[in-house]
């Protein structure tokens, strides 16, 4: 701050400059009106401004003279002063800053501030003008004077320019720090900008001090959107990177407190702490920090982060030691190098175990990680002590209800470990202890019982194995006892199919028939069976010649299960029953078929109908067989009915002839879905045609036409057309064409989209005309050969020759006896040009008849 004496010197200097610049300039004739105006109204700002506007193009000295007169009369006029200062600064723009004109403008600014010290715009422009002149000290003092003169509410305008000024490279850092500290007292939220500046000038001690203050202030809100977490990381990074430049801070405790607070950046913070000691060349301490970090982190991500830093640290030590060895290959240096290499190799070997420890710390109930740890101790050289310790720790640590994976695998592997080391008693003890654990699922406990029994089987203790499984299959005395899901697994174990299956397999192999049979019956009683178990039981009884018991087993199976699971049981049951009794027990067999047909869904019923019909054909009556086929055609799934009707018709024709098949054809056409009626009509008409029933066949074609769209069912209409050519006449052929047009029109009405597609496809039909023309030429060649054959045939007959009018492509004469012969003339083209049919020659058999 300037003293009182300095202010007096400035005022005296201003007075002397005013006297020096007070040059009298005579006004011109044009100036007289304005002179008269300002003389009459010397205190009017507008009068002076009008005068200055009139003198816009005059020399600067004349304008300066007018400005001086104006401010002498109106020393506190902001408009006049601001305009005067602006003109003076613009007038010297581009000149050397060492010229006296710059000092004159500085003096003018000082004169204005004597009267306008409360105007921040004047202060700002003055300071900006001083910054152009690179007068650092004077600029700083002027900013300070502005802060003293202006009220606090306007300080922000000064500080915005002040901070820009001090951030210049030419400003000493100590000055900047002092100014910024004053600034933070007014606006403490700008501390982040201050920290960025300190980082830029590498004042690390002050950076740490400001960050600590910032973190101590719980109410601080970042204007840059940073969180306390970000500031913590920034502080730890700076502390670890520049430990020699920072004093008075317990870096170890600061970083460790951050590790306790921010769990998502634990790995990075541990690396910062180790880097701190590395920068201080305390390598052993840094290594201890790394080891502590690897054993304390709880996530694989943090572990990998620390592991990378640790290995890079060891690599750098090895590289540095190699350089030392090249310069001084002494024994001490070589020994130290060997120690570093051995330590590094040991670290690499321990990596899987260290990572496994982290994973187990993250979830101690992870079964797979415990087993992985056992494998790590087993390879390459088994460490028996650590393997046993790992198994023991896993059993103590894992909560059976929270286990991730099959906990039974831990106990089984532990027991087999003792077994492989010829300690069978210890293995039995492990299994016995495991059988009392309250596992999460029955499958775990049943697996242990089975593994226990398998171990005894390996050592040929068959009775011991059976006794173990017998213990596991003990059921409640009361059959209807309800076991809740929250009961221990030991009380629910008798419901395990796995242990029962193993038990019955052992009894079949090493036990008696009656014991095995009783076990199967117990399983059926407890309903712990599958369809395959029922089939196995029945097969076992069959092998031992207990046929009625076998059928009882099948009966139990069909009562326990529903379709589709029971299908194999029913098929085997019926097959075995028919093989056993053939036709001796017809009614009982029929009852079985009726029983299964009353339960089977339509989609799966076809096989049983076929078995039933085949049985009736072999051992029953053909009439009964036809009744079964008739039921099947009505009851099977819609997709199977067409095949069923075809089989029905085939068998009926073999047993009863054509008359019976006509009735079946009629039923099929009535009951089949529309997509199958067309094919059935073709087969029906073909059958009638074979037996000479032409009118019946034509009626069938007419009936089936309503299900045949001419655009998609070309085969149907071609077949009918060929039929009419061979067996019809001109009227019937025209009737066929009429029906075809009618059906096509009805389908177009029902499905206009298909009609549109048909029009689009017509374009492709035009491309086929060339091929059709080639075919017509080939037909003409065949026509000539056919005419020669007909002429030869006409010489053999004495009947009246009849000329048949055909399309232009084919014409020939032939002799016929009936007057209903088809006479295809040009009328067909008049009715519909699109219905051009391929004309075939008359069969030789028909010529012989004629």
From Swiss-Prot:
It comes from the Eukaryota. Residues 761-771 have a biased composition (Basic and acidic residues). Residues 793-812 have a biased composition (Polar residues). The keyword Hydrolase does not apply. Residues 818-836 have a biased composition (Acidic residues). Residues 761-837 are annotated as: Disordered. Its main location: nucleus. Pfam families: HAT_Syf1_CNRKL1_C, HAT_Syf1_CNRKL1_N, HAT_Syf1_M. GO terms for cellular component: nucleus; post-mRNA release spliceosomal complex; Prp19 complex; U2-type catalytic step 2 spliceosome. HAT repeats lie at residues 25-57, 58-90, 100-132, 134-168, 171-203, 281-316, 477-509, 511-543, 545-579, 584-618, 692-726. The keyword tRNA-binding does not apply. Gene3D superfamilies: Tetratricopeptide repeat domain (1.25.40.10). Keywords: DNA damage, DNA repair, mRNA processing, mRNA splicing, Nucleus, Repeat, Spliceosome, Transcription. It is found in: Nucleus. Residues 772-792 have a biased composition (Low complexity). One of its GO terms (biological process) is DNA repair. PANTHER family: PRE-MRNA SPLICING FACTOR, PRE-MRNA-SPLICING FACTOR SYF1. Identified in the spliceosome C complex. Involved in pre-mRNA splicing as component of the spliceosome. Involved in transcription-coupled repair (TCR), transcription and pre-mRNA splicing. Belongs to the crooked-neck family. This is Pre-mRNA-splicing factor SYF1. It comes from Dictyostelium discoideum. The gene is xab2.
